Curated annotation (Swiss-Prot):
PROSITE patterns: TOPO_IIA
Domain named Topo IIA-type catalytic: residues: 32-496
HAMAP family named in the record: ParC_type1
EC number: 5.6.2.2
Protein name according to UniProt: DNA topoisomerase 4 subunit A
Keywords, alphabetical: Cell membrane, DNA-binding, Isomerase, Membrane, Topoisomerase
Membrane topology, as annotated: Peripheral membrane protein
Organism: Rickettsia typhi (strain ATCC VR-144 / Wilmington)
Catalytic activity entry: ATP-dependent breakage, passage and rejoining of double-stranded DNA
Residue(s) at site: Interaction with DNA: K40, H76, H78
GO BP of this protein: chromosome segregation; DNA topological change
Gene Ontology CC annotation, any one: chromosome
Subcellular location: Cell membrane
Length: 737
């Protein structure tokens, strides 16, 4: 028994070396496809095993268990489940744009159902799969030993069509991943033909032929052309894909929405479940139900809540909330012909394929030329035999060593003599001179053509173009499998604004916010608030009647505005939540809470005595962080935000000075500190009231509403100091107690 050898090595170095070996194995032998044939090793071994089993399109099917057994036994020493899953995917028409395997039996569904066990299903190769391995028996590719040195397997497939782009690929390796969507083969062929004639073509030139991905499940790509082109230029990006739908008119003016195509790699059953959950949670109130009427084709029927619902708005809400709109990633990270993985752009991938085809045709031509030369040598011998048949037969019968004598007599090689001696007498007697001459002539013509191809690059590229055109004809846009399935429709998502309130049922509500910042929502108006309980030391501060479709404006003491959808506020008497969980108000106080009304003028004022008017449309915040509107100096606060519903404004400060002036003296601004409303020293502005001058000035003294009709003494210009308020004005210097 051999004695074990122990070495002292650095643990970190040993670990890194082994991890690197594992990473390289994962990248090169498992996860990333080869740019030339678009296959990973497991795909290549599976298809080659099927070729060895003669599972051609015109042959019978064989059990998948037999195929998987051959693959794991001869070529791929891994689990049978992984190999069978690969086989199943290559047969699924909703997974591959051009399926490589023709499956018979249950191979799963777009609902996410699993395929039947391999002992029940059968398979064979498709026509397009045969194109991947066409001429593999003509020394077009290198072979290497299998894992146990018992057989040989191809290093690469000849690949008569660009399978990498046609069927796409995806995989996750160590530290890198790939995600290539499928494309239309007819368009790829157009791009290849153009690239042959214009080797210096760029991505923008190629994109005149390749519009973008072509998914097996169809759908609509809504990205702009410049976004698509940018993704193919860098080799990285993404595409937004939407479901295809149509409006079906029904009786009595009603209608239903029918979805006929869904995004690539979206499971139909999970999509329906997702919509059903949203329905249950009342997140999409414009629809009443969804049902699946699919057979071999997809048909999802969505019923609107009533016929007044705009189908476009209904679908926009579903696109926003569900996988009816999905994002497909693009990461063209592949193993190049030099066995180095890298991200390529669309032109580089096509160029690699063309170089591969050039090499394949060169090797095939060399192989065929050698075969022709060998056959010509044999025909030369057969002609000699035909002309000297009796003499040769006599030598064979009479001489002990006929081989040497025939070589010397007819000046032929040892190999040629072996042909004569290994040919049966009956075959020699049936030789016909004209047949030998015709075959010799035909072979010489073929030899001349092959030699011309090998010597002249232009002739070689003619053959490449001819074979690409042949594939293009076979899978053209006028064929069932070749017709483009995914269409394009530019939708500018940056400017697209969906009115979320259109999806909410309009109901009356009452919003209550306490002094400590706890907010809750009660159903209805004129609600009995006596039963509402607050924490010790807390009490109600704001009570607002609104509707579930309203937007609520929250103004902080630092002049920042926050926007909430009324329907998003917690419902119920016992479900108050802190305002800090809904908006990022921090430790600042709430100055006011208002119901948003479009184009309404609001008056903002700070304790420093400044203020301005702002349009309500300018204060809507799109994020939880809010929007800063009024700039407040340190030590001061925003004291009020009021809707402008009068022609005059009254200001009262700590020095107990009251000033009334026309509201038109205050400018409208979008943001800032504002202008001086009332001038004072060593004091702060405490309160403001907007009213109509004709009605007089009113205030609440804690007992009843007081009204002062004669306000002439308090009138002035904006920025004045003001005078003492009327007798009976509250001592706290506020218009409401």
């Amino acid at each position: 028994m051999k004695e074990a050898k122990i070495e002292n090595i650095d643990f970190g170095n040993a670990l890194s070396e082994r991890y690197l070996a594992y990473a390289l194995s994962t990248i090169m032998s498992r996860s990333l496809p080869d740019v030339r044939d678009g296959l990973k090793p497991v795909h290549r071994r599976l298809l080659y095993a099927m070729l060895q089993l003669r599972l051609e399109p015109n042959s019978g099917y064989k059990k998948c268990a037999r195929v998987v057994g051959d693959v794991i036994g001869k070529y791929h020493p891994h689990g049978d489940v992984a190999v069978y899953d690969t086989l199943v995917r290559l047969a699924q028409h909703f997974s591959l744009r051009y399926p490589l395997i023709d499956g018979q039996g249950n191979f799963g569904s777009i609902d996410g159902d699993n395929a039947a066990a391999m002992r029940y299903t059968e398979s064979r190769m498709t026509e397009i799969c045969m194109l991947l391995m066409k001429d593999i028996d003509k020394d077009t590719v290198d072979f290497r030993s299998t894992y146990d040195d018992s057989d040989l397997e191809p290093v690469i497939m000849p690949a008569s069509f660009p399978n990498l782009l046609a069927n796409g690929s995806e995989g996750i390796a160590v530290g890198m991943a790939t995600n290539i969507p499928p494309h239309n083969l007819h368009e790829l062929c157009d791009a290849l033909l153009y690239l042959i004639d214009n080797p210096q073509a760029g991505v923008n030139d190629i994109m005149n032929f390749i519009k973008g991905p072509d998914f097996p499940t169809g759908g609509i790509i809504i990205d702009q052309t410049k976004v698509i082109n940018a993704a193919y230029t860098t080799g990285r990006g993404s595409f937004r894909v939407r479901s295809r739908w149509e409006k079906e008119e029904l009786s009595y003016g009603t209608y239903q929405i029918v979805v006929t195509e869904i995004p690539y790699q979206v499971q139909k059953s999970k999509l329906i479940e997702q919509i059903a959950i949203l329905l249950k949670d009342k997140k999409i109130p414009l629809i009443s139900s969804i049902r699946d009427e699919s057979t071999d084709i997809i048909r999802l029927v969505i019923e609107p809540r009533d016929r007044s619902c705009d189908p476009q708005i209904v679908m926009e809400s579903l696109f926003k909330l569900t996988n009816l709109e999905s994002r497909i990633q693009l990461n063209m990270n592949v193993i190049g012909s030099n066995n180095v993985p890298r991200v390529m752009n669309i032109v580089e991938i096509l160029q690699e394929f063309l170089v591969h085809r050039q090499n394949i045709i060169t090797r095939r031509s060399t192989y065929l030329l050698n075969k022709i030369k060998q056959r010509l040598e044999i025909l030369k011998v057969l002609k000699i035999v035909y002309l000297n048949l009796d003499e040769i037969i006599e030598i064979i019968r009479r001489e002990d060593e006929p081989k040497t004598i025939i070589m010397e007599r007819f000046k032929i090689s040892e190999i040629q003599v072996e042909v004569i001696l290994n040919t049966r007498l009956r075959a020699l007697q049936k030789l016909e001179e004209h047949a030998i001459i015709d075959e010799h002539s035909n072979l010489q013509k073929q030899q001349a053509i092959l030699e011309k191809i090998l010597k002249n690059h232009k002739e070689l590229w003619k053959i490449v173009k001819k074979e690409i055109k042949s594939v293009q004809t076979q899978f053209g846009l006028n064929t069932i499998i070749g017709a483009r399935r995914t269409s394009f429709e530019e939708v500018d998502l940056t400017n697209q604004v969906i009115d979320i309130t259109a999806f909410i049922t309009k109901e009356p509500i009452t919003i209550i916010c306490s002094k400590m910042g706890w907010i809750r929502l009660l159903k209805g108006h004129n609600t009995d608030l006596s039963t509402i309980k607050y924490k010790e030391g807390d009490a109600e501060k704001f009570i607002i009647e609104a509707y579930t479709t309203d937007k609520i404006l929250i103004i902080s003491s630092k002049g920042r505005f926050f926007t909430l959808l009324a329907d998003n506020i917690s419902k119920g008497k016992g479900t108050a939540v802190s305002i800090k969980l809904l908006v990022d108000i921090g430790n600042n106080d709430i100055t006011n809470i208002l119901v948003y009304k479009p184009y309404q003028l609001l008056l903002l004022a700070s304790s420093i005595g400044k203020g301005f008017l702002v349009n309500s449309n300018e204060v809507i915040a799109q994020t939880k962080a809010g929007k800063q509107i009024m700039n407040i100096p340190e030590g001061y606060a925003c004291i009020t935000c009021l809707p402008v519903n009068g022609n005059s404004i009254a200001c009262i400060n700590e020095s107990r000075r009251l000033l009334i002036f026309n509201i038109n003296e205050i400018p409208e601004m979008k943001k800032g500190q504002g202008v001086v409303l009332q001038r004072f020293k060593n004091a702060k502005l405490l309160d403001i009231k907007i009213f109509n001058k004709e009605d007089g000035l009113s205030w609440n003294d804690g007992k009843k509403i007081q009204l002062e009709k004669n306000i002439v003494a308090f009138l002035g210009k904006r920025g004045s100091a003001g005078t003492l308020p009327p007798i009976g004005f509250p001592k706290n210097n506020r218009f409401s107690s």
